Amino acid sequence: MVISQGDIWWAALPEPVGSGPGFDRPVVIAQGDTFNRSQLATVVVIPLTSNTRLAAMPGNILLSASNTGLPRDSVANVTQIIAIDRSLLTEQIGRISPRYLELLWKGLDLLFDR
């Protein structure tokens, strides 16, 4: 399976615990391509949600369905960044633009006080 940073994939996440991400949902591949091309069994992703109200939260990014291949407008929720097993990635949906990727890094910088 070939994955690249900025790709959007469907992920079959397990049942959520508390307010964590779960179930089948789109995710953005956040992990760098050096690691994506390696033999690592895991990949770092940012889960997406169709709850567009979360776009108002600091660091989150509203992704337009028309620009990404997503079935509906969604929000990259940077506070839920997780590492998952690659086998949970089921189908590539699309890709975020370089502009969105830059906004994603700014959101992560904010999350980590950088």
Q: What do these predicted ranges mean?
A:
Residues 1-114:
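Conserved functional hotspots at enzyme active or ligand-binding sites that engage polyanionic ligands
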